[in-house]
């Protein structure tokens, strides 16, 4: 056990899906996993382990922002032997051609956070997803006939940013979605020798002000979840 996870040793599978919302973790476990059991509940950050088509998989919330998700990702990797983390979350779009509810596979993550500079001796660290996880996710999406976008995310430290002009810069550089965790998770995975990927569903559009409801974010976004789960099976087949 750790200060933040009260699961016993061996409670987690080697692959963990991580939404920000612990209630989304509960939804994923109850909807997609068989024989799912809750294995941790410290601070109501729920974690579950079950099987998907016979494959043992865990799901656990990571909270909001890089500090929170980094704690859980680090402890899962170093204390529970987790090898792969797939973040399944929401993001905001800044480009006009990116639409509400589209699925984005984040091959890289820009950020205004300094966490990766701290761990990388104040140099720029290229926060990127694992190639094999990315490839498997793209293949899973194609197999299910789900259109996805593949490209860069932006992990912001501030949800309510005062620098709205930065959205213009993001759009110029082709950023597909703004969220708050991917760069941190990629940094943790690199530091501790694990693999990581972020898959996001567009929950709101910063330009058009369209948005999904809190209930929709908690109980839908199934395409993203199915892509993540199927990608695990594809990854197993490819070794």
Swiss-Prot record:
Binding positions for phosphate? 20, 24, 43, 87-90
Q: Name the enzyme group at the top EC level.
A: transferase
Catalytic residues, per the record, are 204 (proton donor)
Record: residues binding a purine D-ribonucleoside: 4, 179-181, 203-204
Keyword entries, A-Z: Glycosyltransferase, Transferase
Q: Tell me which domain of life the UniProt entry assigns to the organism this sequence originates from.
A: Bacteria
Q: Which GO terms describe its cellular component?
A: cytosol
User: A biological process (GO) annotation for this entry?
Assistant: purine nucleoside catabolic process
Enzyme Commission number: 2.4.2.1
Which residues does this entry assign to the site Important for catalytic activity?
217
Reactions catalysed, semicolon-separated, are: a purine D-ribonucleoside + phosphate = a purine nucleobase + alpha-D-ribose 1-phosphate; a purine 2'-deoxy-D-ribonucleoside + phosphate = a purine nucleobase + 2-deoxy-alpha-D-ribose 1-phosphate
Gene Ontology terms, MF aspect: purine-nucleoside phosphorylase activity
Q: Name the CDD domains for this protein.
A: PNP_EcPNPI-like
Function text: Catalyzes the reversible phosphorolytic breakdown of the N-glycosidic bond in the beta-(deoxy)ribonucleoside molecules, with the formation of the corresponding free purine bases and pentose-1-phosphate.
Concerning HAMAP family, the annotation shows: Pur_nucleosid_phosp (MF_01627)
Oligomeric state and partners? Homohexamer; trimer of homodimers.
| Membership in a protein family | Belongs to the PNP/UDP phosphorylase family.
Q: What is this protein called?
A: Purine nucleoside phosphorylase DeoD-type
The protein's organism comes out as Glaesserella parasuis serovar 5 (strain SH0165)
């Amino acid at each position: 056990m750790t200060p933040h996870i009260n699961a016993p040793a061996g409670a987690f599978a080697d692959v963990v899906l991580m939404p920000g919302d612990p209630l989304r973790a509960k939804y994923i476990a109850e909807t997609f996993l068989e024989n799912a059991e809750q294995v941790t509940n410290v601070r109501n950050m729920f974690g579950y382990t079950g099987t998907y088509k016979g494959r043992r998989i865990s799901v656990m919330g990571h909270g909001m922002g890089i500090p929170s998700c980094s704690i859980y990702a680090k402890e899962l990797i170093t204390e529970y032997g987790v090898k792969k983390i797939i973040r399944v979350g929401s993001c905001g779009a800044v480009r006009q051609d990116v639409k509400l509810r589209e699925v984005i596979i984040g091959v890289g993550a820009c950020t205004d956070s300094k966490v990766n500079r701290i761990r990388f001796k104040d140099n720029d660290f290229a926060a990127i997803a694992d190639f094999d996880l990315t490839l498997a996710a793209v293949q899973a999406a194609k197999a299910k006939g789900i259109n996805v976008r593949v490209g860069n995310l932006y992990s912001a430290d501030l949800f309510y940013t005062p620098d709205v002009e930065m959205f213009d810069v993001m759009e110029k550089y082709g950023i597909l979605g703004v969220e708050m965790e991917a760069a941190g998770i990629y940094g943790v995975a690199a530091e501790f020798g694990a693999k990581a990927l972020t898959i996001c569903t567009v929950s709101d559009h910063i330009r058009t002000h369209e948005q999904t409801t809190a209930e929709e974010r908690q109980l839908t976004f199934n395409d993203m979840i199915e892509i993540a789960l199927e990608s695990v099976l594809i990854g197993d087949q490819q070794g």
